[in-house]
């Protein structure tokens, strides 16, 4: 059963700090996928006008993130909560530091009305200290099949213009872009004509983002519990994977790293040996036994973000969805996109580190 979406429309603020806060607030509309095997996460993680970088990280040959360092927010929900707990709950604050100390990616979507300016602002901040910005483009028409994370106002022509502005915001700077989580794995709800149109839009996005030669693109690759590798390979082949660096797995999901590596390796063999990244933010204990996707109990933080995976085809482990952000108001939990400090604490406490 789908839950209603809270529509959030915000004007573009003047400063980088205000832009980040506005985008973070707008991220409340992003949450559970219409397919119960996945959850789509928050649009951003705090304020990119203040932070640090983490790294350096080594990587295997053919990895554009080789040697990259990644940006860490100084004002993420985890950082703010940890700091507020420092005196009264010192042990718990130390646990939340496990989340606060790690880099996260920045989501941009339909809430970005001036996407070129927003991308430029985020790029300028996230690249401070030589860090590699990692962004998510999340605005494909009929996103989430009109479900909780839908964007009914985006048309194909508007999307092309949006992607062109997104690419212009990056310019010639180096960046990694995760392209449209759910767009390919979740395409089945569309008509045949709309499916063809989506594949064409994905191809356009890859070509546009890659035009500068400085952007590495990873297309939606779903996860091991959703579509077969053969199905995803066919969709990737028709979506511009030949021009992309590779694909992204497990975005906002809980499936364990080893399962993703096995699935990704099979998928890679079907798409010309392309590399992939894995969202490991919440997969430390794998998926819940009942496959619950909405704030499942007993989960844990997974491997921390790094480009030093020691796995030839895996370019990076990244926390694409911020651990502790609600998947939805299931079982009395906070609304989708809201920060849940106690849930985040549990993820941290159960981590293997």
Model-based region annotation:
Residues 3-20:
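Bacterial N-terminal signal peptides that target proteins for export
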Residues 28-31:
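C-terminal motif of bacterial Sec signal peptides marking the signal peptidase cleavage site
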Residues 33-36:
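Bacterial signal peptide processing site
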Residues 38-61:
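Ser/Thr/Gly/Pro-rich low-complexity, disordered linker/stalk segments of secreted
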Residues 64-169, 322-326, 331-348:
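N-terminal carbohydrate-binding/catalytic regions of secreted carbohydrate-active enzymes
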Residues 72-99, 222-344:
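Surface-exposed substrate-engagement region within the catalytic domains
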Residues 105, 130-134, 174-178, 214-218, ...:
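Structural preference for beta-strand elements that scaffold enzyme active sites
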Residues 149-174, 181-215, 229-231:
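Active-site cleft segment of glycoside hydrolase catalytic domains centered on the general acid/base Glu
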């Amino acid at each position: 059963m789908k839950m209603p979406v809270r529509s959030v429309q915000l004007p573009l603020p003047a400063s980088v700090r205000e832009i980040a806060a506005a985008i973070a607030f707008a991220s409340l509309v992003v949450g559970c996928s219409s397919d119960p095997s996945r959850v789509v996460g928050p649009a951003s993680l705090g304020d990119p006008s203040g932070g640090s970088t983490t790294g350096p990280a080594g990587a295997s040959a053919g990895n554009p993130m080789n040697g990259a360092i990644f940006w860490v927010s100084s004002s993420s929900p985890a950082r703010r909560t940890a700091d507020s707990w420092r005196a009264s709950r010192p042990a718990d604050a130390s646990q939340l530091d496990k989340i606060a100390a790690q880099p996260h990616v920045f989501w941009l979507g339909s809430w970005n009305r001036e996407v070129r300016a927003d991308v430029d602002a985020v790029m300028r901040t996230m690249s401070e200290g030589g860090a590699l910005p990692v962004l998510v483009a999340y605005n494909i028409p009929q996103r989430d099949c009109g479900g909780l994370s839908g964007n009914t106002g985006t048309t194909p022509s508007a999307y092309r213009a949006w992607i062109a502005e997104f690419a212009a915001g990056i310019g010639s700077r180096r960046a990694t872009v995760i392209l449209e989580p759910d767009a390919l794995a979740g395409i089945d709800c569309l008509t045949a004509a709309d499916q063809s149109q989506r594949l064409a839009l994905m191809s356009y996005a890859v070509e546009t983002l890659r035009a500068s030669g400085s952007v590495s693109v990873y297309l939606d690759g779903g996860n091991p519990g959703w579509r077969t590798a053969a199905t995803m390979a066919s969709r990737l082949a028709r979506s511009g994977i030949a021009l992309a660096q590779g694909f992204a797995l497990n975005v906002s999901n809980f499936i364990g790293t080893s399962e993703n590596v096995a699935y990704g390796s099979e998928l890679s063999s079907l798409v010309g040996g392309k590399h992939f990244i894995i969202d490991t933010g919440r997969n430390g204990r794998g998926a819940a036994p009942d496959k619950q996707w909405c704030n499942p109990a007993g989960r844990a933080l997974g491997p921390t973000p790094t480009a030093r995976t020691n796995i030839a085809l895996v370019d990076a482990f990244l926390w694409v969805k911020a651990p502790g952000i609600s998947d939805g108001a299931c079982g009395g939990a906070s609304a989708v996109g809201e920060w849940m400090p106690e849930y985040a604490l549990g993820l941290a406490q159960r981590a293997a580190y």
